[in-house]
């Protein structure tokens, strides 16, 4: 599947959200914009992420710009595994196979709860002189690593921008495109993550 360009998503999301988005909740929402009313997007390896305010809450709208093998099956497996694990380190999300309609057709989206707080890099910069906060953060990171290992989960793109720090004791992972859960064992990784935070020998079959 060929996904829309950034420009095509920008054009579509300037229209009435209830028309271009199939999700009733997001369709009632308001998109965060910049400058002359253009949708504000954060670009990742596979998706563009937009902020939508709906029913008093904030959500992430993720629109894909790059194909990934078995995208729907991956998100379905991840969702079911996280539901069983009841992990405190992930946000709720819903994969929608025809969630947005642009000029060229209908495409999948992911609606995610918004994780509030700075990312890991921002938290460390803000607390670089706070020894207690940094020590607690170290403990929390070790606890997170143990939790993932014990539950058969690998994030796949563990880097500072994908780790939200609400406070030094509460860490939340975002961006699940490259995640591994046991059910996905037969597949290769959909992405290799930010190379500066991966083993240099990692390949797609190192899932």
Indicate residue ranges for each PLM-predicted region.
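Conserved activation segment of eukaryotic-like protein kinases, specifically the C-terminal portion
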Residues: 187-202
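Activation of the activation-loop gatekeeper triad in protein kinase-fold domains
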Residues: 175-180
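Conserved structural core of kinase catalytic domains
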Residues: 91-137, 186
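ATP-binding glycine-rich loop module of kinase domains
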Residues: 37-39, 45-92, 103
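Juxta-kinase regulatory segment immediately upstream of eukaryotic protein kinase catalytic domains
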Residues: 1-40, 72-75
